[in-house]
C-alpha cells in the first residue's frame, strides 16, 4: 500500500445479522472520508444512538450521521427508490444533509412493487403448502436479485431513459404478473402505477447517480480512508450461510470488492462484529438457541435486557449462548483481521455463561460449524462453562476497567477462535466503546 493512498476497512457481521454493525461503522467513520454499502437492500436495519438520540437506517450508509463524510451505495445493493426517499426525508427532517453527500451506482438493480408482492405471495404459498417459511422480510430483496441474475433487471441507469424503461418494464411485469396471478393466487400489479412512480423517483435520483467504482478508486488514490459497511451477517450469506435460510446476497468481506467496484487489494483490514451471545430472526438452524420466552431463564435475560427485536421487521429475535465454533467458520470465510464484541453489557448479572466450543454430529465431534443446514440441525453443542459477573459493564471505555470474569470470557473467545479482539462495545451509545487496536492504525 502506497503511503499516498488511503487505508480501507471492511465491517462484516459474523453471525445472523443484528450484531451491532451500525454503531461501529458510525464510530469508525471518525477516521474515514467515505462509507460504502456493497450488498443487500432495505432489509438491513442499523440502529445508531448518538447523544441519546436513536436513529434507524435501512439503506443509507451509517456514515451519513457524520457531517462531511461521503456515502456510497454500490452496485451490489438492490435499491428501492421509494424506501430510499422515505429514509432521506426522515433524516432531512432531523437536520441531516443527505443528497449532496450520497452517491448511488447506476448499476444498482431496482426493487419495484411487484418484487415485494412476489416475496410476500411466495411465503404465503409455502405456508399453505405445509412448507416452512424462509423467514424473508417481505421487502422484495430476493426477487430483485433473481431478476439481476437472470439478466432482466431494471437498473438505476434505466431511469434516465423513460422509453427504454417502459419497454423493459412491460416485459418484466407481464412475466411476474403471470406468476402472481396464475401460480401464487395473488392480484396483478398495475403497469401505470409502477411506471409513474418510477419516473417521479427518476427525477429525484438523477443528481445522486454516479460511477461509484470510479469515484471510490479516485478517492482511494487521493488518500481517502474508506469504510465498507456489510449488511446482514455471514451465516445469512447465500453461499456460506445456513442455506436455504439465508438472504439473497453475499454478506462476506470478499463481496465488498465485487459489490462496489474496487479491487480486493484495496481491502486492508476486515473487522468482524459479533455479539457476546447469539441471536437469529426467522427460521433456520440455531445450535445454541435457548428458551428465550420464559422469565427467569438466561435466554429471557438476553431477549429483554438486549431488547432483541428486529429493526426492520419488529420480530422478536431468537437468543442463545455464544457459539465459538460458528465464529470459526465466519473467521475462515471472511479472513478476519480482528473482532469487535458487542453487547457485552447484556450479560451483566448472569451467574454462569456457557460457551459453545464445538458440536456432536452423527456420533463424531467437530470444532467448526458444518456447511449444510441439515447437518447443523443435527448438531448438539458442546459447552464450556465460565463464571459470570455481577458488576456493571455499561459505558466502560477501558479494557482494564472490565470485571475480571468479563475479561476472562473475552480471552477465552480469542483462544478458541484464534482471532484477536480489537474492540468491545458496552452500550448502544457511540462513545461507549473500548479500543484495544484501531482498525485504521493496525498493521
UniProtKB/Swiss-Prot annotation:
EC number: 6.3.4.4
Binding site for IMP: 18-21, 43-46, 137, 151, 232, 247, 315
Binding site for Mg(2+): 18, 45
Pathway in which the depicted protein is active: Purine metabolism; AMP biosynthesis via de novo pathway; AMP from IMP: step 1/2
PROSITE patterns the UniProt entry points to: ADENYLOSUCCIN_SYN_1, ADENYLOSUCCIN_SYN_2
Binding site for substrate: 311-317
Cofactors (names): Mg(2+)
One annotated GO biological process: 'de novo' AMP biosynthetic process
A single GO cellular-component term on record: cytoplasm
Enzyme class: ligase
Keyword annotations of the record: Cytoplasm, GTP-binding, Ligase, Magnesium, Metal-binding, Nucleotide-binding, Purine biosynthesis
Residues binding GTP: 17-23, 45-47, 317, 343-345, 425-427
Location(s) in or outside the cell: Cytoplasm
GO MF: adenylosuccinate synthase activity; GTP binding; magnesium ion binding
Cofactor note: Binds 1 Mg(2+) ion per subunit.
Active site: 18 (proton acceptor), 46 (proton donor)
InterPro entries named in the record: Adenylosuccin_syn_GTP-bd, Adenylosuccin_syn_Lys_AS, Adenylosuccinate_synth_dom1, Adenylosuccinate_synth_dom2, Adenylosuccinate_synth_dom3, Adenylosuccinate_synthetase, P-loop_NTPase
Reactions catalysed: IMP + L-aspartate + GTP = N(6)-(1,2-dicarboxyethyl)-AMP + GDP + phosphate + 2 H(+)
Coarse class of the protein's main subcellular location: cytoplasm
Family stated for the protein in its record: Belongs to the adenylosuccinate synthetase family.
Role: Plays an important role in the de novo pathway of purine nucleotide biosynthesis. Catalyzes the first committed step in the biosynthesis of AMP from IMP.
NCBIfam families per record: PRK01117.1, purA
Subunit-level organization: Homodimer.
Protein name from the UniProt record: Adenylosuccinate synthetase
Organism field: Variovorax paradoxus (strain S110)
Lineage, top ranks: Bacteria, Pseudomonadati, Pseudomonadota, Betaproteobacteria, Burkholderiales
Amino acid at each position: 500500500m502506497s503511503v499516498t493512498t488511503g487505508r480501507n476497512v471492511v465491517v462484516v457481521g459474523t453471525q445472523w445479522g443484528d450484531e451491532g454493525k451500525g454503531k461501529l461503522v458510525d464510530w469508525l467513520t471518525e477516521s474515514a472520508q467515505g462509507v460504502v454499502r456493497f450488498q443487500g437492500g432495505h432489509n438491513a436495519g442499523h440502529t445508531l444512538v448518538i447523544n441519546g438520540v436513536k436513529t434507524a437506517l435501512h439503506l443509507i450508509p451509517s456514515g451519513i450521521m457524520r457531517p462531511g463524510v461521503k456515502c456510497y451505495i454500490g452496485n451490489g445493493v438492490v435499491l428501492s427508490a421509494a424506501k430510499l426517499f422515505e429514509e432521506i426525508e426522515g433524516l432531512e427532517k432531523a437536520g441531516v444533509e443527505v443528497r449532496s453527500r450520497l452517491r448511488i451506482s447506476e448499476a444498482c438493480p431496482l426493487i419495484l412493487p411487484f418484487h415485494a408482492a412476489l416475496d410476500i405471495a411466495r411465503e404465503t404459498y409455502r405456508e399453505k403448502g405445509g412448507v416452512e417459511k424462509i423467514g424473508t422480510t417481505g421487502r422484495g430483496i430476493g426477487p430483485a436479485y433473481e431478476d439481476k441474475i437472470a439478466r432482466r433487471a431494471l437498473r438505476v441507469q434505466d431511469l434516465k431513459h423513460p422509453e427504454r424503461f417502459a419497454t423493459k418494464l412491460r416485459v418484466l411485469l407481464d412475466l411476474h404478473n403471470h406468476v402472481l396471478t396464475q401460480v401464487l393466487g395473488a392480484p396483478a400489479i398495475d403497469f401505470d402505477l409502477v411506471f409513474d412512480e418510477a419516473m417521479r423517483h427518476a427525477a429525484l435520483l438523477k443528481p445522486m447517480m454516479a460511477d461509484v467504482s470510479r469515484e471510490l478508486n479516485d478517492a482511494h488514490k487521493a488518500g481517502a480512508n474508506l469504510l465498507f459497511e456489510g449488511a446482514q451477517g455471514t451465516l445469512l450469506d447465500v453461499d456460506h450461510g445456513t442455506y436455504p435460510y439465508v438472504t439473497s446476497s453475499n454478506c462476506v468481506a470478499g463481496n465488498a470488492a465485487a459489490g462496489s467496484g474496487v479491487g480486493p487489494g484495496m481491502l486492508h483490514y476486515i473487522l468482524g462484529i459479533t455479539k457476546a451471545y447469539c441471536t437469529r430472526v426467522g427460521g433456520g438452524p440455531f445450535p445454541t438457541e435457548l428458551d428465550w420466552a420464559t422469565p427467569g431463564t438466561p435466554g429471557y435475560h438476553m431477549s429483554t435486557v438486549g431488547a432483541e427485536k428486529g429493526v426492520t421487521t419488529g420480530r422478536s429475535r431468537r437468543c442463545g449462548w455464544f457459539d465459538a465454533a460458528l465464529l470459526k467458520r465466519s473467521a475462515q470465510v471472511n479472513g478476519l483481521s480482528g473482532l469487535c464484541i458487542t453487547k457485552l453489557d447484556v450479560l451483566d448479572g448472569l451467574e454462569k455463561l456457557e460457551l459453545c466450543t464445538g458440536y456432536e454430529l452423527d456420533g463424531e465431534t467437530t470444532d467448526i460449524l458444518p456447511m449444510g443446514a441439515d447437518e447443523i440441525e443435527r448438531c448438539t453443542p458442546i459447552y464450556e462453562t465460565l463464571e459470570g459477573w455481577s458488576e456493571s459493564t455499561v459505558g466502560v471505555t477501558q479494557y482494564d476497567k472490565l470485571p475480571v470474569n468479563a475479561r476472562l470470557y473475552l480471552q477465552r473467545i480469542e483462544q478458541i477462535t484464534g482471532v484477536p479482539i480489537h474492540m468491545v462495545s458496552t452500550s448502544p451509545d457511540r462513545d461507549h466503546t473500548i479500543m484495544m487496536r484501531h482498525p485504521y492504525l493496525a498493521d
